[in-house]
Regions:
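Conserved core of the sugar-phosphate nucleotidyltransferase
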Residues: 100-184
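Conserved core of the PLP fold type I
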Residues: 282-341
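Short acidic capping loops at alpha-helix termini that bridge into adjacent secondary structure
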Residues: 35-36, 59-60, 88, 303-307, ...
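Conserved beta-loop-beta/alpha segment of the NTase-like Rossmann-fold superfamily
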Residues: 56-128
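Conserved alpha/beta core of the MobA/IspD/sugar-nucleotide pyrophosphorylase nucleotidyltransferase superfamily
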Residues: 155-243, 249-253
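N-terminal "arm"/small-domain region of PLP-dependent enzymes with the aminotransferase-like
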Residues: 229-284
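Acidic donor-binding segment of Leloir-type glycosyltransferases
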Residues: 36, 43-62
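N-terminal glycine-rich phosphate-binding loop and ensuing alpha1 helix
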Residues: 1-43
Length: 341
């Protein structure tokens, strides 16, 4: 899904604002007293190994190779590293994540030994969700196919960072993982095993919700673009937001005080009417220019001949400026720069 960006390299070699994901991870993890870092490699694995050997000889890093990475999924990759999980307490992290330092601090400093980091659902999130109770017990893992928008307010997204104790791995997780692979095959996800464990009353795994800490999962070029904005330097972030000219729903925590909005529009009545007619609006083909001009004239009380309906102000501005002006023209200058651009 990342196309040319991963044509010759694995995902963790992607750069976000000039820093590779693997470099960021290793810098973050090197602050802690870890016995070792274990990396499961597959696609273009030797390039990653060579890069790490050349740059991180001072860190104890071991590698596990998945030679059939193109025929298996992450459940098999994790199974290959099962001996490491059973030998020590483990932090499990996926390589396509970018997180701020505080998230790892929060995980390691928590007194619970077995944790799954989760984040309250936001619209940009995709993939496996969970439900949790007031005691942070995971009640249910919800795969992507089982997602229900009407229940989204109850969901938390798995961040795909976990803390497993040696006891949990050896006595609960790995035995179930091995059995799951035998029954379901190797082209599955390791979270499905965690889903089975939630059915057991005595599992020690708990969820740990994060707060406003920044994180992002990079699966495609749009994710990379958004992550580059979120994790940019303070001095550059405003310009990166500004050049988007909108679409700020992709940044739920961003408050935009400059965009030309009317806090009284649309009102509740209009929202309810749109919701009630949504299926018709979505499935039916819209009317042409003639009908739209007629309706606009009707609602504004003017002749149809005096109305031109366009797809937003930018479309009409272009026509007016190029074809219907002579000499000097004076215009207002809105904050989102649609006239000069």
């Amino acid at each position: 899904r990342l196309g040319e960006l991963t044509k010759n390299n694995t995902k963790c070699m992607l750069e976000v604002n000039g820093v590779r994901l693997i470099d960021r991870y290793l810098r973050q993890l090197s602050k802690y007293s870890l016995d070792r870092i274990v990396i499961v490699v597959g696609y273009e694995g030797q390039k990653l190994i060579d890069y790490i050997h050349a740059n991180y000889s001072d860190i104890n890093i071991e590698f596990v190779n998945n030679p059939i990475y193109d025929k298996t999924n992450n459940i098999y990759s994790l199974a290959l590293a099962k001996d490491y999980l059973c030998a020590d307490d483990t932090i499990l992290m996926e390589s396509d994540l970018i997180v701020e330092d505080g998230i790892i601090d929060k995980l390691l400093n928590h007194t619970d030994k077995d944790l799954a980091l989760v984040a309250k659902y936001e619209q940009w999130m995709d993939g496996t969700m969970v439900r949790i109770d007031d005691n942070r017990r995971i009640l249910q893992f919800i795969p992507k196919a089982g997602f229900r928008y009407e229940e989204a307010d109850d969901y938390y997204k798995t961040v795909n960072i976990y803390k497993f104790s040696r006891e949990f791995s050896s006595k609960q997780y790995i035995p179930f993982l091995e059995a799951y692979c035998k029954v379901m095959g190797n082209n599955e996800y390791y979270e499905q095993v965690l889903s089975v464990l939630t059915l057991l009353q005595n599992t020690t795994l708990r969820a740990l919700p994060i707060g406003n800490e920044k994180w992002y999962e990079i699966d495609d070029v749009q994710d990379l673009d958004i992550a580059s904005t979120l994790f940019s330097e303070d001095k550059n972030r405003f310009q990166l937001y500004h050049k988007r000219y909108g679409g700020f729903w992709r940044f739920p925590k961003l408050l935009d005080f400059c965009y030309l909005v009317n806090p009284f529009f649309p009102n509740k009545r209009m929202r309810d009417e749109i919701r009630n007619n949504f299926d018709i609006l979505l499935e039916s083909y819209p009317s042409g220019m003639g009908v739209n001009s007629l309706l606009a004239g009707k609602y504004f009380g003017i002749k149809q001949d005096y109305v031109v309906v366009g797809n937003g102000a930018a479309e009409l501005i272009k026509v007016v400026m190029e074809e219907h002006t002579n000499g000097r023209v004076g215009v207002i200058f809105p904050t989102f720069d649609e006239y000069p651009n």
